[in-house]
Design a protein with these regions (language model features):
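A short local loop/turn or secondary-structure capping micro-motif enriched for an aromatic residue
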Residues: 54-55, 101-104, 137-141
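A short hydrophobic beta-strand element
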Residues: 77, 89-100, 114
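Short, solvent-exposed loop/turn segments at secondary-structure boundaries
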Residues: 105-109
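A solvent-exposed, acidic/Ser-Thr-rich amphipathic alpha-helical stretch
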Residues: 13, 18, 31-87, 111
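Short, low-complexity N-terminal intrinsically disordered segments enriched in polar/charged residues
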Residues: 1-40, 140-141
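Short beta-strand segments enriched in hydrophobic/aromatic residues
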Residues: 38, 98-100, 133-136
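Beta-strand elements of well-folded, non-transmembrane domains
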Residues: 27, 98-104, 120
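Short beta-strand edge/turn micro-motifs at domain boundaries
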Residues: 93, 112-140
């Protein structure tokens, strides 16, 4: 639980580990690995680079696997050092720049800087994503 006015050191350290584990899970190349980070409720929306939105975990899982991960021979998602954590009680928001390296099965390598915002809810002993938003800045910005 995030408590207002309390030292944030422990929470920031915990969320740093959580975000790094989240990136490691997506870097496995299968959408099954990061499943533990996502709430499975109906009606949740997750924004991605493409397509615009996924409605629920199943749609996110299947869409990212088919459109992105199945075409990759290697994926590496890395969170930047500038992690911001804010929240109160059972809800937290994380904001962090990320870097993605993707090597396609045809050998082409693509790298991009990304912006990431996650909305987390504490459920039992775990924090799970109830919304996230991944975006890429326009070229030249």
């Amino acid at each position: 639980m995030l408590e207002p006015g309390r030292s944030r050191g422990a929470e920031d350290t915990a969320f740093r580990k959580l975000i790094d584990s989240y990136c490691e899970a997506w870097s496995t190349g299968t959408a099954d690995a990061p499943a533990k980070f996502y709430a499975k409720d109906n009606g949740l929306v997750f924004y991605d680079v493409a397509p615009f939105a996924y409605h629920g975990w199943k749609e996110l899982h299947d869409g990212v696997q088919k459109e992105f991960l199945d075409n990759a021979s290697e994926i590496k998602l890395t969170a930047g050092r500038d992690l911001k954590v804010t929240g109160r009680g059972m809800i937290a928001r994380t904001i962090v720049p990320m870097h993605l390296m993707e090597r396609s099965k045809n050998g082409k390598t693509t790298e991009m800087d990304l912006r990431y915002t996650g909305i987390w809810e504490k459920r039992g002993a775990s924090w799970v994503l109830v919304h996230d938003h991944l975006s890429a800045p326009l070229a030249g910005s």
